[in-house]
Amino acid sequence: MILAIARKEFLDAWRDGRFRIAAAVVLVLLGVALLLAWQQVQRTRAEHNAAAALERENWLNQGEKNSHSAGHYGVYVFKPLARLAVFDRGLEPFVGTTVFLEAHRQNQAAFLPAQDATAMRRFGELTAATGLQLLVPLLIVLLTFGALAGERERGTLRQVLSLGVRPRDLVLGKALGLGAALAVLLLPAAGCGALALAQLPGGDVGGGWARLAWMGAAYALYLAAILAVCLAVSAIASTARAALAILLVCWAANAVLAPRLASDFAQRILPTPKLVDFETAMNKAVQEGLDGHNPRNDRLQAFAQATLKKHGKTRIEELPFNFNGLVMLESERMANEVFDHHFGKLWDHLEAQDRTVTWTGLIAPLLGLRSASMALAGTDFTHHRHFSVAAEQHRRDFVRVLNEDMMNTPAADGHHGGVAGRALWEKLPAFRYDPPPPAHALRAATPGLLVLFLWAAGAWTALLLVAPRLKPN
């Protein structure tokens, strides 16, 4: 009986001209969004590759200079764009894509893509992800609002139940048929999208296919929950018009109201520190120590005395190496401890904000889906943090090599560490970023996936509880 009802609902859905038109519009929008994003990712990658090549040439051709001065000359490194950013751009437009690496400082990523955008960005950006998150649920609303309430109004519900059809079988049959209609619409589109992503060369986030599979599961849970909620509302609403009104209000609350309220809530309970306060505290810690009572000069003087004692010397000039280079190494080590503490604390705070927003998804499933989708696409904050840590490690490695060269080079011609040239610059490799494995993304996506699972389980449980109470009047 359930399969017979499902077959009828499936055929009725596809015979409905309104559904076909709405489905065509959604598919066109998804296709256009995917195509535009594909072109943008290609263009951005080309720009980054060209800029990286030019930056490498500038580094190699900077001329002869003191090796520590080369550390202040610095290099720019560029964040590679994940392949799945074609589908879900996540935070990419709002976090920096370029980091300047230099001695003594850990800089944050700069040059946000959103800074170059028009004022229209405030209304959101159409991507394939936002299409599935917002437009497909609206399509489900239009498909299901009259599934049960409409039959009640027309009097056909009484006739069906009088034939001995159990209310639960009727509800499950309709759910199966309407779900199949959506699957026939979305699965081929998803397959075409996956093939398009496969054609995008290079720059992949690790384990792209595993990430894509988990992303598919996340969206399936989300749409399954939406379908169950819509059918439950249609089952209890007195009229189809009432069901449509209720579902449109729920859609607007989920799509528009909940993200803003969740963001404001997270900001209220976990306020983001001001940039000027963060930098002031970090600079103070560099000069006075993390405890605020250990001045940098005192620490360096103690280090100098310990070095002399270690080598059995009484004067700096008697040391068998250039002490200025060793001081630079120690100065970097002390500063790095401060950077690790302050940036680690800041990043932990921002991740706590994200988790707060994700768990508020218990009242709006879109929040859980966005969190899981961005994490699996490699465009969330945890992936940005991973890149920032990799860039900082590259900075420390290249500054260490420069300072070691300075330490091993006698001072000459007024330079603290002699003069270095292209031979040294070529020893420093260009920055190469290795993205994290799928396990990293799955850990970041777990809270969102759990929220979606709870929503799907709760929605279908509610639908099964409502079904036996289905009445003709």
Predicted regions and their residues:
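Transmembrane alpha-helical segments and their membrane-interface loop/helix boundaries
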Residues: M1-L126, R241-N473
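Helix-loop-helix units of permease transmembrane domains in multi-pass membrane transporters
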Residues: A4-R15, L142-V184, A467, K471-P472
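Selective transmembrane-helix segments that form parts of the transport pathway or gating/packing helices
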Residues: A22, T127, L135-V136, L143, ...
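Long, hydrophobic alpha-helical segments
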Residues: Y76, A82-E92, G124-G150, R154, ...
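Hydrophobic/aromatic residues in alpha-helical transmembrane segments
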Residues: I140-T144, C192, A225, V229, ...
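Membrane-interfacial helix-loop-helix connectors in multipass membrane proteins
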Residues: G191-A217
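Hydrophobic alpha-helical transmembrane segments of polytopic membrane proteins
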Residues: W214-A237, A459-W460
